[in-house]
Regions:
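N-terminal charged/capping segments associated with class I S-adenosyl-L-methionine
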Residues: 2-14, 18-156, 160-171, 184-201, ...
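Soluble or luminal CAZymes and related metallo-dependent hydrolases
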Residues: 66, 212-216, 281-285
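Short, conserved SAM-binding segment of the class I
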Residues: 171, 216-223, 227, 292
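Short SAM/SAH-binding signature in class I
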Residues: 171-180, 235, 380
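Mobile active-site "lid"/loop adjacent to the S-adenosyl-L-methionine
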Residues: 178-219, 238-275
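Substrate-binding/catalytic lobe of Class I Rossmann-like enzymes that use SAM or dcSAM, i.e.
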Residues: 230-350
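Core SAM-dependent methyltransferase catalytic element
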Residues: 379-401
Length: 403
């Protein structure tokens, strides 16, 4: 073997201290740059194109569905501006759009009950410039569940920009939605010896990921606080961690990690390429999400209205228990891994033709391994609802009476 792969155990990981200023991340970037040069940083966080994510991202879809009541409540409780200006809904991290249809439809329905059918609603889908926007536009135009099918006053838009940058001018967004996207870090701070998943790292590497995650979360919140209107709401959905530090995907990640080691031994993947295969996904605990808000429960004019953790059932496992079709179970789990995680791993391979062959072979091997070891994904969903408050007004100082 080229190096014994490590396994992920659901053990508690220390929470790193976050820095005070959300946007002052230059020093952190310099420290992380010492661990991982720019030449070794793979791209990450872009899903597999051609509609693959839409077909196989049932777990993120299920997590988003659990949060729909919170989104509907946010749409009912946000402050609606008087007048006729369009209401703005922001879909941060839209990917290829399929998983955005139900949330946007639910939010629009709740807003329509408040403002009627004539007021314009702008829905802006935001994702990285390398996202498969062609599939997104096809969904918006042709999907039977598209949110604009019976509403001529709904206007979809798309922006190809990272949500770790300014996406909108100040105070333009009435309602924001971000589902399963903010789990991806802005930068990968370090290579992970023996594995590709951040939940497997320890020591200095763990500290680097903890620091990057704390900085990125504060940056994300600060940018959204600028973009939200006073009285607006932001709903954020994450793949969560249990109190024991488990993601629920440990069997899947460990199987894939073993296969990557075998592919190095078979010389399908180079040892240096394997070292650069890192996922920039970082699931967070509730305490890590709440840390920026402090004792006063506020950060950058944002306050926490809800923060809840849910268990997410594995639909593929439920079907397997009913029909006993282990081939279908393995196929669905392997296709899920490929659509969401393999593009990030494959970005460590420079040749496009080899990347496709790598993805095909990894999926085939992973399916066989998962069929040999059938197991459910016992994953978790963390949902937050944030409200934008008006800035506190400091009363003028009273002048001392003249003597």
């Amino acid at each position: 073997m080229s190096g014994e792969p490590i396994r992920i155990d659901p053990i508690s990981q220390p929470q790193a201290e976050a820095e005070d200023a959300a946007l002052e991340v230059t020093e952190a970037q310099e420290r992380q740059g010492e661990q991982m040069s720019a030449a070794t940083i793979p791209t990450h966080g872009v899903m597999e194109g051609g509609g693959s994510y839409n077909l196989h991202a049932r777990i993120p879809a299920g997590g988003g569905n659990l949060a729909l009541p919170y989104l509907e409540d946010a749409a009912r409780s946000l402050a609606v501006r008087p007048g006729t200006d369009p209401l703005v809904l922001a879909d941060y991290g839209s990917s290829q759009g399929k998983n955005s249809m139900a949330p946007m439809r639910a939010a629009i329905r709740c807003l329509r009950s408040r403002v009627g059918n004539e007021r314009a609603v702008m829905v802006v889908h935001v994702d990285q410039h390398a996202n498969d926007f062609n599939t997104l536009f096809d969904v918006l135009h042709n999907d039977a569940e598209r949110y604009s099918v019976d509403d001529p006053n709904v206007f979809p838009f798309a922006i190809g920009r990272s949500f770790y940058e300014n996406v909108f001018p100040r105070e333009q967004v009435d309602l924001g939605w971000c589902s399963y996207a903010a789990v991806w870090l802005r930068h990968i701070p370090a290579l992970i010896p023996g594995h590709f998943a951040s939940v497997a790292c320890t020591g200095e590497v763990r500290a680097a990921f903890d620091l990057q995650a704390a900085d990125d979360w504060r940056l994300f919140l600060s940018l959204r606080a600028r973009e939200l209107r006073v009285g607006g709401r932001l709903v954020v959905v994450f793949p969560g961690l249990s109190d024991e530090g488990a993601t629920g995907f440990e069997p899947l990640f460990n199987s894939a990690n073993e296969i990557l080691g075998e592919m190095v031994d078979e010389r399908v993947v180079g040892a240096d390429e394997r070292k650069r295969m890192v996922l920039g996904a970082y699931p967070r605990r509730r305490a890590q999400l709440l840390e920026p808000f402090g004792r006063e429960d506020q950060f950058q004019s944002l306050s926490v209205e809800h923060c809840a953790l849910f268990d997410l059932p594995d639909g593929a496992w439920t079907d397997y228990q009913l029909d006993g079709n282990v081939e279908s179970l393995g196929s669905r789990h392997a296709a899920f891994f490929r659509a969401i995680f393999v593009p990030s791993l494959a970005s460590a391979i420079s040749d496009a033709g080899r990347r496709l062959a790598f993805a095909d072979l990894l999926e085939q091997k992973l399916k066989r391994r998962l069929c040999e070891r059938p197991a459910p994904f016992h994953s978790f969903v963390q949902t937050m609802v944030l409200a934008k408050q008006a800035p506190a007004v400091t009363p003028p100082a009273r002048s001392s009476p003249s003597k």
